A protein has these predicted regions:
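Active-site-proximal, substrate-binding regions of enzyme catalytic domains
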Residues: 2-151, 159-218
């Protein structure tokens, strides 16, 4: 949590606008509901939520979390992302071919290489929609600096970052800001650029990375 708070603080301090995709907000609500309705004796428990487990949240308290999600996000300065149009300012279809990704190709690639997406077609569609939105908002342009980049899809899904950027031909060895980026990579960029005086950041991310290694995702 401290690492995430640090990242959000750096983004705000450097003028970033923070948004959540509506479909991902719905996913959060579904996760909370599944956790609320979980069967304690089920051999296959629902997705664990550390804070709720540790604090032993009741059903009523989880319902309150769901009801207050919008205001909680707002308190963090996170708004719901507006819909991106395929039309330009004068009502014409955006002409840059690079603004349109191979949607089915990317979906197939991600599904093939990240097994857990086979369990939820909706989750796959949500993430591919988000990537498509970002590239469309960028009008297919590639950026070399974080300041010039119009939008980024920030996620802790490191497998998705790897596979999507591989399919979209964003090499880790090129100085380009990819449309989808991990929280660790973005924090590293911001720390190097703006916050090297905060020597606590690397330690926070080492802790975060260690926690992720204990429970890796496919």
């Amino acid at each position: 949590k401290k690492a995430a708070d640090t990242l959000l603080d750096m983004l705000r301090e450097n003028g970033a606008s923070l948004f959540i995709f509506p479909q991902h907000k719905d996913e959060i609500i579904d996760i909370l509901r599944n956790f609320r309705d979980r069967d304690a004796y089920d051999a296959k428990p629902s997705q664990p939520l550390e804070r709720l487990e540790a604090e032993q949240f009741t059903t009523i308290e989880i319902d309150q979390e769901i009801q207050s999600l919008t205001s909680s996000l707002k308190s963090l300065g996170i708004a719901e992302a507006p819909r991106e149009s395929y039309l330009d300012e004068i009502g014409s279809l955006k002409k840059n071919p690079a603004a349109y990704i191979n949607y089915s190709g990317l979906s197939d690639h991600v599904l093939k290489n990240i097994p857990r997406y086979s369990r939820s077609n909706q989750m796959l569609q949500n993430d591919i929609d988000a990537i498509s939105y970002i590239i469309l908002q960028r009008d297919g342009m590639r950026y070399e600096t974080i300041e010039s980049c119009q939008s980024i899809f920030l996620t802790t899904n490191y497998s998705l970052v790897r596979e999507a950027n591989q399919f979209l031909r964003y090499s880790a060895y090129k100085m380009q800001i990819s449309p989808i980026i991990s929280d660790i990579d973005l924090t590293s960029i911001l720390w190097i650029k703006y916050a090297m005086q905060n020597n606590n950041i690397p330690r926070l991310w080492l802790i975060s990375a260690a926690n992720a290694a204990v429970s890796p995702t496919a």
